[in-house]
A protein has these predicted regions:
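Conserved strand-to-loop turn within each blade of WD40 beta-propeller repeats
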Residues: 4-7, 59-63, 103-107, 151-154, ...
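Loop/turn segments within WD40 beta-propeller blades
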Residues: 48-54, 90-98, 139-146, 198-204, ...
Length: 342
């Protein structure tokens, strides 16, 4: 597992539980430390493995760079430099015909870096305009390798086809076109900054979160607001918020940082299943490991916690006559709210 810190350091962890104990500590295999000549100068905002080969990974930082790393040597293979602070980047998990890295920066344009041509071409001239403020989150569709979603501080979420000169396919509208274009909130996704987005595993829907404390689910083919109500989803992050969805569960879940906890919702009903408690400072990011049905969360308390599914939950202490755990149907293939986990 890759992790990036606010100090610019990148650490690689071995996730194997060699102890076979229920509670264990993952070992750090190696790191790009403060003394490394190519270490990021400021906070690392995003790290990602090259989707087809773990021999390479990428990182981006507030130091205005995107770096491509050789995993074996921990040396940079390429560096892309930007004029603005970098908030987020993403490589397509399904692309076979391009090696584009989408980058969101403090500028209002979506920027694309081509790993095939390298930094000699710097940043592609195809920079899509359309947003009015900084781009806080970017994500490629897992369904179509040319479709890119972007979220901005201008309250808008856009879907792009990077093959098209005009670029923009859809600007989603929280009102589904039912309000006049003269209304200030027309063609906006949220009533505040949109600082996180995530496609569902099949790519048919897109989830977004905003500083209006709302999460919304969109049809990714036509941009329709599905109007699923998740209630208040606390979000006071000043930068990108990285949340994730489950893969391979009988019901699909979304995991969202919520203060010092992680809120778990069923995607299509909006029901809040549980709150995962274990961190003691704000959670900034979480990622799902589908092979083992595990969730990992990173927090400002300097800890990364691993969460595993639990099919049973403890019986309340006030019932002294009952000693057995009871199966909670809501947690079949799902998640336990036990404070002991993590």
């Amino acid at each position: 597992m890759l992790s990036g810190g606010s100090d610019g350091v990148i650490v690689l962890y071995d996730l194997e539980n060699s102890s076979r104990q229920p509670y264990y500590t993952c070992k750090a295999v190696c790191s790009v430390g403060r003394n490394h000549p190519d270490v990021h100068k400021y906070s690392v905002e995003t790290v990602q493995w090259y989707p087809h080969d773990t021999g390479m990974f990428t990182s981006s930082s507030f130091d205005k760079t995107l770096k491509v790393w050789d995993t074996n040597t921990l040396q940079t293979a390429d560096v892309f430099s930007f004029e603005e602070t970098v908030y987020s980047h993403h490589m397509s998990p399904v692309a076979t015909k391009h090696c584009l890295v989408a980058v969101g920066t403090r500028g209002p344009k979506v920027q694309l870096c081509d790993l095939k041509s390298g930094s000699c071409s710097h940043i592609l001239q195809v920079m899509f305009a359309g947003h009015r403020q900084e781009i806080l989150a970017v994500s490629w569709s897992p369904r179509c390798e040319y479709v890119l979603a972007t979220a901005s501080a201008d309250s808008r979420v856009k879907l792009w086809d990077v093959r098209r000169a005009s670029g923009c396919l859809i600007t989603v509208d929280q009102h589904n076109g039912k309000k006049s274009q003269a209304v200030e909130s027309a063609n906006t996704a949220h009533n505040g900054k949109v600082n996180g987005l995530c496609f569902t595993s099949d790519g048919l829907h897109l989830l977004t979160v905003g500083t209006d404390n709302r999460m919304r689910l969109w049809n990714s083919s036509n941009g329709e607001n599905t109007l699923v109500n998740y209630g208040k989803v606390c979000n006071d992050s000043r930068k990108g918020l990285k949340f994730t969805v489950s893969y391979g569960c009988s019901a699909e879940f979304v995991f969202v940082p919520y203060g010092s906890t992680i809120a778990v919702y069923t995607i299509y009903s909006g029901e809040q299943i549980t709150m995962l408690k274990g961190h003691y400072k704000s959670v900034d990011c979480c990622v799902f490991r589908s092979n083992f049905q595990e969730l990992y969360s990173g927090s400002r308390d300097c800890n990364i916690l691993a969460w595993v599914p639990s099919l049973s939950e403890p019986v309340p202490d006030d019932d002294e006559t009952t000693t057995k755990s009871q199966l909670n149907p809501a947690f079949e293939d799902a998640w336990s709210s036990s404070d002991e986990e993590g």
